[in-house]
């Protein structure tokens, strides 16, 4: 049924459906048609022209409209009214399920079973040369890729609306922030982007006449014929997620899943931004940002890089078990860092949390539970009989539920899926709703970083925590990061893979050059190099070799390790403070330097947590050498030197 949707003085014809605003015309405030014909369809660009003088933006949107042939174009303003309109429409169409009033303004979506995670095998870095993309990225000649994608995008939005979303990665007005514009045919993507980025009119107003922006084209690749019923989760089995680093542009086809479709997230803020950062002398990293305040009121900011689903969100939102210590969060996934007088300052370019649901509970992450108590989009979790959400690890299982595939589910029942919620099921929630949000989280200047932590999921070999001997050694530690695979990426769960800096899926250029860029920060800092962050490595996941049980309780107890890191940031790179012992791999906590007051942990577990097995480390080093061979002459000599030095220290010990 056609109805008028009045929004901020604009009268737009619309139809309630999953694709929203399915009218073939737009009307201006006087009720007259305005716009230009494209083929047999009518598109209005007058609203965009009224809002911006940036001709590059206007031309780009018009080009995408001519290519994708949507039924209409809608310029998103980012308002709450707009969000409500889209979610109401998607509830009516079956794309969303509205949750009960105890979780206000929150919704559940179920994806197509084939569209549940990032698709690394279909993700491309189309640099001008294969060498610039590097051996860890999929590559195709950019012109060839565009020829491949053009027929796929041609008419891909028929029967749908093209939504135009101006968005800012980072606080508006920050010299660290950058602006993008995404067009999409998915209202679900629009609603997620409203939460995850600063999106809408306030951003469009920032794009001046000659400003650059990162253009992001997205289509689910499921055009609708006239009268055709839409899917609750339209997607296409032929998926491409493509980045052009020299052009600073993105194209994504076929997927509606977060990391593939929310192009401000991994695509822009890591793959494209890392390339921009290399050129601009800054860092775009797969890192959380947190602050730790000690019992004397002193605060330090820490950035930490872990692969997906290895505890970034839980650490960023940890509740301290130590009296007088407080953890606050600036971001749980991405950090953009720039140097000022040797000091790295970081912003979180995102505006929301896109967290893994399974395992999130009142005991593991109470702040996350509070953050997702309202205004949240859930994907692929289970639905309880009272219209709330559930996932493994949240609480005791409900007596019955509807699983992520839409089937009836009973705990331990016959014919069940293994999981009620998909292992990579997600929540999208505003950062501002987290009770432990740091007051500086939205500061356009950024926050000063005192420590950088690397870590991964290792069941053996790597101790609970150790510290780099110097900056070069710290870069090597980041480069040697390895982790057991998780459900957030394609592949066999549990398989160990090298994941340097937790950036393997996200580095937008040759990773050998990326290592060199990190090494260059020391020279860039010059005489202020002592202000560079101290570098550490942690492993919460080490297991007892006999029982297979975790040796460290993790979660809030990890603050004990953060306290040691905090104290080491106040010390020089030696052992004079009595809190560290030098070993072949770096500085490890000396006896009794980790605050264990109130923690029940036996001496044998503690000993195993910090044990160093020479043969295991030499095996890891051999694996690292093999991994680095692929970079050829793009591997910095300093990384080779660090491998040699580590081997010498291990053999001397």
UniProtKB/Swiss-Prot annotation:
Its EC number is 4.1.1.32. One of its GO terms (cellular component) is mitochondrion. In eukaryotes there are two isozymes: a cytoplasmic one and a mitochondrial one. PROSITE patterns: PEPCK_GTP. Keywords: Decarboxylase, Gluconeogenesis, GTP-binding, Lyase, Manganese, Metal-binding, Mitochondrion, Nucleotide-binding, Transit peptide. This is Phosphoenolpyruvate carboxykinase [GTP], mitochondrial. It catalyses: oxaloacetate + GTP = phosphoenolpyruvate + GDP + CO2. Mitochondrial phosphoenolpyruvate carboxykinase that catalyzes the conversion of oxaloacetate (OAA) to phosphoenolpyruvate (PEP), the rate-limiting step in the metabolic pathway that produces glucose from lactate and other precursors derived from the citric acid cycle. GO terms for molecular function: GTP binding; manganese ion binding; phosphoenolpyruvate carboxykinase (GTP) activity. It is an enzyme of class 4 (lyase). Its cofactor is Mn(2+). NCBIfam families: PRK04210.1. It comes from Dictyostelium discoideum. GDP binds at residues 309-314, 358, 457, 540, 550, 555, 558. Phosphoenolpyruvate binds at residues 118, 259, 424, 426. Mn(2+) binds at residues 266, 286, 310, 333. InterPro entries: PEP_carboxykin_GTP_CS, PEP_carboxykinase_C, PEP_carboxykinase_GTP, PEP_carboxykinase_GTP_C, PEP_carboxykinase_GTP_N, PEP_carboxykinase_N. Belongs to the phosphoenolpyruvate carboxykinase [GTP] family.
